[in-house]
């Protein structure tokens, strides 16, 4: 009998299938995941709780937030950068905006604006920013804000403003801050002659197309003059300085110091 039992092939035991268990686990996970999503959507953590704005100078934080279309208590996950960018297009001085999200509920708008290089003074007392692209921004009246840029007055040729803006944008911040007023003083031979009134009491006479190359030398030139000397500095081909009330000019030597570089 033992011999016959050895010849009979033994039937392998089949393992029970687990498809039913896997399907049950999947349904349970899906169920609880759905519950978690519903709970999150209805919780305060799914809402926008705070909106911050950085990089804005021309527009106020309230203006940017209002124009962006963002509001508190809106869905946190329903904030799209392209939508915000399109909403901010009416604010003409904004070059770009990026949106960052920080959990829970914080939205930050990072604003990049055109640079203010001067102020355009209107006849009615209004004051508008001249941007580095040559555009006079009339959306915002700066009449009640601190004058931290040159004030343009007596300017009869608006077509020259883009050229002036380009030159001013290349000046270092320190030199730009020293300029108080700019007037257009053309001659028969040169329509781009300008006069700059400095905050230290001096006058500078130059031309628009040389301003960005010559004006950054201003701090170095002033160091060559006797202390407390005020007068007229001419920045053309060869700079020279005439004190107020004097007949002769003080020679100016170029190249003794490096000009101040514009901020990138």
Swiss-Prot record:
One of the Pfam families matching this protein, by short name: POTRA_1
Residues in compartment: Cytoplasmic: 1-23
Subcellular location: Cell membrane
Membrane topology (UniProt): Single-pass type II membrane protein
Domain POTRA: 46-114
Residues in the signal sequence: none
Extracellular-side segments: 45-264
Keywords (A to Z) from UniProt: Cell cycle, Cell division, Cell membrane, Membrane, Transmembrane, Transmembrane helix
Protein name, as recorded: Cell division protein DivIB
Organism: Brevibacillus brevis (strain 47 / JCM 6285 / NBRC 100599)
Gene field: divIB
């Amino acid at each position: 009998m033992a011999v016959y039992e050895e010849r009979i092939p033994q039937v392998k035991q089949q393992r029970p299938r687990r498809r039913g268990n896997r399907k049950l686990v999947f349904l349970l996970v899906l169920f609880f995941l759905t519950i978690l999503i519903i709970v999150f959507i209805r919780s305060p953590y799914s809402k926008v709780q705070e909106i911050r704005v950085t990089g804005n100078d021309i527009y106020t934080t309230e203006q940017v937030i209002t124009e962006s279309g963002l509001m508190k208590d809106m869905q946190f996950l329903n904030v799209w950068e392209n939508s915000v960018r399109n909403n901010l297009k009416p604010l003409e001085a904004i070059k770009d905006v990026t949106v960052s999200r920080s959990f829970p509920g914080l939205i930050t708008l990072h604003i990049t604006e055109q640079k203010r290089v001067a102020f355009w003074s209107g006849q009615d007392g209004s004051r508008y920013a001249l941007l580095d692209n040559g555009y006079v921004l009339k959306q915002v009246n700066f009449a009640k804000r601190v004058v931290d840029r040159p004030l343009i007055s007596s300017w009869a040729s608006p077509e020259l403003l883009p050229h002036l803006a380009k030159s001013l944008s290349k000046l270092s911040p320190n030199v730009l801050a020293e300029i108080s007023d700019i007037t257009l003083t053309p001659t028969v031979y040169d329509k781009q002659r300008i006069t700059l009134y400095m905050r230290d009491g001096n006058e500078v006479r130059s031309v628009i197309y040389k301003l960005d190359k010559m004006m950054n030398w201003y701090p170095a030139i002033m160091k060559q003059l006797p202390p407390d000397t005020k007068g007229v500095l001419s920045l053309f081909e060869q700079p020279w300085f005439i004190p107020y009330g004097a007949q002769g000019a003080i020679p100016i030597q170029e190249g003794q110091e490096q000009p101040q570089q514009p901020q990138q």
